[in-house]
Amino acid sequence: MRSESPVCLRVVFLVVIILLCAEMLFYILYTHKTTMHHNISKEEEETLCSANHILQEQDTVVLVWMWPFGHEMKQSSCSELFHITGCRLTDDQREYDKAHIVMFHHRDIYRYLSELLRMRRPLLQKWVWMNMESPANSQRLAQLDDLFNLTASYRRDSDIWVPYGRIVAASKEHETFKIPHKDKLVCWIVNNWNLHFKRVRYFTELRKHVWIHTYGGAFKKTLSVKEYYKTISSCKFYLSFENSIYKDYFTEKLFNPLMSGTVPVVLGPPRENYEEVIPSDSFIHVDDFKSPQELAEHLKYMDQNQEAYERYFTWRQYFTAERSYFGLEHACRSCEHIKNNKAYRVFKNLSKWYWG
């Protein structure tokens, strides 16, 4: 018995300590709850109610504040196009309090920036800044810092990366690739003509050495959508010249010829950047040549050497090219992102990150 007494005393002492701690914890929680109940403001109460609405939603609700360029998309397409389930897209701003995500297109933000700065935001809601234009073609707006939680753009270091297109493995559903019939050597379709653009200066020199079939608003030869793809497909080479040069900025000017069975001749970021997203032997980079004249000689050589030309399509044995769905894909990929990433943060330096 003597040996057991110290053990019993320790047990009793431990129980007393636990009871005291429990009582103290209850007091703290009860006091905090009572204080919150009496001092909570109307704005805080509305915010908590909004958070409750969000928690009650079974699907992830994505509110597209305004469809980019007014092009409304079918809102049930996340599962159909991208196999992303559990997402509900809406453009009804009355569902703001229920939305897990609110998407804002940069080009439209200037219209209601002052309104955004004043808007009450539900506790669990995330705002996504969406942009597919380069910094040169995006208005730099004040007060974007500390406003958004996530970024969705063509840049590969965005939170949600949405390129203009993708190279994907060819499936059984894809038809065996055959190079389309070609009756033109080099083509270019362009609307935005600016003598200060590098692409215009390069084109002006290149056309001195090789015939280029030109189309688009800049040449007063507009094409319908059907004519557009048919024209690209009929050319051996297509000038995929970007209007501005930034890392990761390769647009539909690159992916449309890849999808159409044409070899893109690219002017944009360095070759190494392109090779991070498309096969190295699927395109020609203007930087591969010392001058436009040297490039022209290479194109004319390829015109006379079918076997060498066909090597640009070796990758099509295993892969194919797909376009993205502007606006819709941003919304669906953002939904997928927050379903897999629950952490909450605020983007502190969006302006510096994007415009430098």
Map each language-model feature to its residues.
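A short, histidine- and acid-enriched strand-loop-helix "catalytic/donor-clamping" loop
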Residues: E133-A136
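Pol beta-like nucleotidyltransferase catalytic core
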Residues: R2-W129, Q139-G356
